[in-house]
Structure formats: structure tokens, C-alpha cells
Amino acid sequence: MQIPKLKVLVEAGVVRQVEAIPEADGWAVWIVHATRSGERREVLERQRGGVRVFATLDAVARAVAGAGLSAFQVHVAGLAGAEAEPP
């Protein structure tokens, strides 16, 4: 899904969840939205196809806010050091 489609889904009020998930070079954004037959989970894509990877969570926040959303979840599993025990 690309940003224009996300904006349409936001305006329709069918977006249920937005998740930022670590990728090799940054963060991918997954969108869960309602459909006629239930729910669907789609990744945010670049204009020319392929997964859109954001370098920072700030960049994710700007894109999410620009689409009309006010919140998203961050998953840290898979980050370097995320599974390390606290000192």
C-alpha cells in the first residue's frame, strides 16, 4: 500500500493498527485495516514498488502523521541488543 491509499483508508475510518517493525536498514510500516471480509495487513510501499524502509522512527512518525494518523506501535524484537538482559 502506498501513502495515497493509506490516506483514503484513514479518511474512511477503517485503519485498525499501524506498526513500525525493524528491517535491516531501518523501519518498515505495516497497516492493519478493515475490509468487507474481515481485516487485511499490508506493508507501506515506495511509489515504484517494494517495501518503503524509513531510516528513523521520526521519519515513520512524520509519514504516519501526514496520512492523518496520530499513533503507531513500535516492535523492537529483532533489533540489535533488544534481547539483551538489563545490567
Predicted regions and their residues:
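A short, charged, amphipathic alpha-helix used as a generic interaction element across diverse proteins
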Residues: 53-68
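N-terminal intrinsically disordered, cationic/polar leader segments
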Residues: 6, 11-23, 35
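Short aromatic-glycine-(Arg/Gly/Cys) micro-motifs in beta-strand/loop hairpins
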Residues: 20-48, 69-81
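Short terminal or interdomain "cap/linker" segment that borders an active site or interface and mediates
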Residues: 81-87
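Short Gly/charged-rich anion-binding patches and loops
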Residues: 4-5, 59
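Residue-level preference for nonpolar/small residues embedded in alpha-helices
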Residues: 1-2, 56
